[in-house]
Amino acid sequence: ILIGLVGSEMCIRDRSYDYYMEGITPHIADIISACDKERVAVCQALGVDALALGDMLVKSYKLEPKDDLYDLIQSIDSYRALRNPTNTKHRFIVEDTMSGLVPLASVGHALGIPTPMIDAFVNIASAVCGRNFWEEGRTAEKLGMAGKTPEEIREMVR
């Protein structure tokens, strides 16, 4: 999602590019890392042991650890052939926002965990796609967590 939104100008121009190799710059990797810290904080608040994205990539792709996420992503050979979405209505943006970012942020809000970076991307995706992903997405309310205490929410995900 983040790559698609930040690279949305290239989507609009219909310029084809390597989604991960060109789409992720060092600065975009920093933004992804900031969002990932929020994801990990929400998971920890739920009592879920979550690996940071970099650690997950090292483990999943059997890579040597790198100093930063950008270098790590650039070292994943299987990412090299993946092309970008051709428009901002692509499932990488729409589905990842509704089913990934909205639940993370919404559950974070219910637990009192701030998610300002994730919130910003949900708002940007909503504006770019002309939709309200806060209403359409999988919110804590839609997941049956409305009015629950943090402990009750943790019990639901165990």
What are these regions (language model features)?
Residues 1-7, 12:
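Single conserved hydrophobic/aromatic residue that forms the stacking wall/gate
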Residues 8, 24, 57-61:
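Glycine-rich beta-alpha junction loops
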Residues 14-15, 21-24:
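Long, compositionally biased stretches enriched for glycine and/or charged residues
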Residues 15, 29-158:
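NAD(P)-dependent Rossmann-like dehydrogenase/reductase catalytic/cofactor-binding core
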